[in-house]
């Protein structure tokens, strides 16, 4: 399945919640009709079956993190192999992706922009260039903007926006140096309460 390149707000309307695919610090406002489905008249959303709810939750999380279906299934398999709660393991793996960490540290306004920075070799991990968005960041890894990329206006603008967002407690960021440390693995309480990972586990457990 190809990566979706259409209007970002349409995806948020389809899921009925802000997926934070657009830059900025404010949630999508009421003019965007987040509670109505995409389309000229915003068709009424049908009541979903259990399977439909599970599928919709998986699609929502997949879109939040910008993951293709095959990648997402592989993350689930890995989460299921690990000790502990499979759903929480899944979210931790997604949060540990380099593109997500770059976004969380404020070097990019969206995860899509973070993926682009990583792919364009603008990010270093422990002093070495890493251009793989799915690279798993480990505790105590230092993630930084590459020296020759620090003058990019979009990175500076993103850091200014990040000052207005809630800062993740599992990361330590030095905005002036454009670098940060992955201090610890995030706990479930650190992450979005709007995600019901149990539905995803139920879907893949069938």
Curated annotation (Swiss-Prot):
Sorted UniProt keywords: Ribonucleoprotein, Ribosomal protein, RNA-binding, rRNA-binding
Entry keyword annotation includes Ribonucleoprotein: yes
Gene Ontology molecular functions: rRNA binding; structural constituent of ribosome
Keyword Zinc-finger carried by entry: no
S4 RNA-binding domain segment(s): 96-156
Pfam families reported in the protein's UniProt record: Ribosomal_S4, S4
Superkingdom per UniProt: Bacteria
A Gene Ontology term for the protein's cellular component: small ribosomal subunit
PROSITE patterns found in the cross-reference section: RIBOSOMAL_S4, S4
CDD domains xrefs: S4
Transmembrane parts of this sequence: none
BP terms from Gene Ontology: ribosomal small subunit biogenesis; translation
Similarity field: Belongs to the universal ribosomal protein uS4 family.
Assembly description: Part of the 30S ribosomal subunit. Contacts protein S5. The interaction surface between S4 and S5 is involved in control of translational fidelity.
Function comment: One of the primary rRNA binding proteins, it binds directly to 16S rRNA where it nucleates assembly of the body of the 30S subunit. With S5 and S12 plays an important role in translational accuracy.
UniProt name for this protein: Small ribosomal subunit protein uS4
Organism annotation: Mannheimia succiniciproducens (strain KCTC 0769BP / MBEL55E)
Taxonomic lineage from the root: Bacteria, Pseudomonadati, Pseudomonadota, Gammaproteobacteria, Pasteurellales
Gene of this entry: rpsD
């Amino acid at each position: 399945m190809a990566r979706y390149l259409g209007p970002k707000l349409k995806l948020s309307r389809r899921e009925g919640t802000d997926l934070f695919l657009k830059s900025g610090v404010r949630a999508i406002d009421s003019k965007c009709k987040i509670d109505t489905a995409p389309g000229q008249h915003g068709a009424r959303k049908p009541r979903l079956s259990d399977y439909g709810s599970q599928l919709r939750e998986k699609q929502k999380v997949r879109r939040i993190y910008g993951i293709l279906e095959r990648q997402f299934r592989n993350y689930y398999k890995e989460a299921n192999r690990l000790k502990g709660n499979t759903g929480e393991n899944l979210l931790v793996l997604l949060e540990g992706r380099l593109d997500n960490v770059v976004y969380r540290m404020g070097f990019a306004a969206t995860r899509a922009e973070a993926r682009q920075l990583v792919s364009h070799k603008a990010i270093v991990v422990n002093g070495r260039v890493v251009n793989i968005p799915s690279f798993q960041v480990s505790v105590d890894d230092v993630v930084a903007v590459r020296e020759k990329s620090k003058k990019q206006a979009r990175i500076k603008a993103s850091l200014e926006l990040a000052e207005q967002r809630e800062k993740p407690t599992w990361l330590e960021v030095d905005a002036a140096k454009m670098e940060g440390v992955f201090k610890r693995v995030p706990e479930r309480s650190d992450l979005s309460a709007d995600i019901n990972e149990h539905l995803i586990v139920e879907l893949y457990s069938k």
